[in-house]
């Protein structure tokens, strides 16, 4: 007989306390669970429908990871037209957060290196950047060729094919 013996892990975020979050905003249970998944699962796809609260999930998870010392700052790449909206929602959820929002001018050729240095050295909680701007940040040879991503996937394919 065949049966499904793989069950996805379920995350419970009901115990998580969010220090510094706007007390007038209450996260819904599915948002708390998604944040727990981000904190404990290390890789997470937020595939909720529009309006389900993905922005709050990302912001709260980023702030909690920083508070716990799991990261020093989070860079969030969003569609270009959503950078301002994302930052606005982030500040609504965490009014005291130090958020850097990129503009088109920041990534003009003459300003790009200086701005990347500002991202690297600044004490920001979250950096919000547009997709087209993110593509202009130079990557190491390993990252740009996809070698670090491709190798584990090849070994995974070999293991499952046997």
Predicted regions and their residues:
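Residues at the beta-strand->loop junction immediately N-terminal to the Walker
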Residues: 47-49, 77
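SF2 helicase/translocase NTPase motor core
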Residues: 13-26, 42, 54-162
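Pre-Walker A segment
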Residues: 2-47
């Amino acid at each position: 007989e065949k049966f499904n013996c793989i069950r996805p892990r379920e995350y419970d975020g009901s115990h998580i306390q969010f220090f510094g979050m706007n007390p007038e905003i209450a996260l819904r249970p599915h948002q708390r669970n998604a944040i727990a998944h981000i904190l404990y699962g290390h890789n997470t796809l937020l595939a909720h429908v529009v309006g389900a609260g993905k922005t709050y999930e990302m912001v709260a998870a980023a702030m909690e990871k920083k508070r716990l010392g799991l990261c020093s700052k989070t860079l969030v790449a969003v569609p270009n037209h959503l950078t301002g909206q994302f930052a606005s929602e982030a500040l609504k959820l965490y009014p005291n957060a130090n958020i850097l929002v990129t503009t088109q001018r920041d990534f003009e050729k003459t300003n790009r290196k200086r701005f990347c240095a500002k991202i690297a050295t600044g004490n920001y909680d979250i950096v919000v950047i547009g997709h087209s701007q993110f593509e202009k940040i130079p990557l190491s040879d390993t990252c740009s060729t996809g070698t670090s991503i491709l190798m584990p996937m090849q070994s995974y394919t070999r293991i499952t094919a046997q």
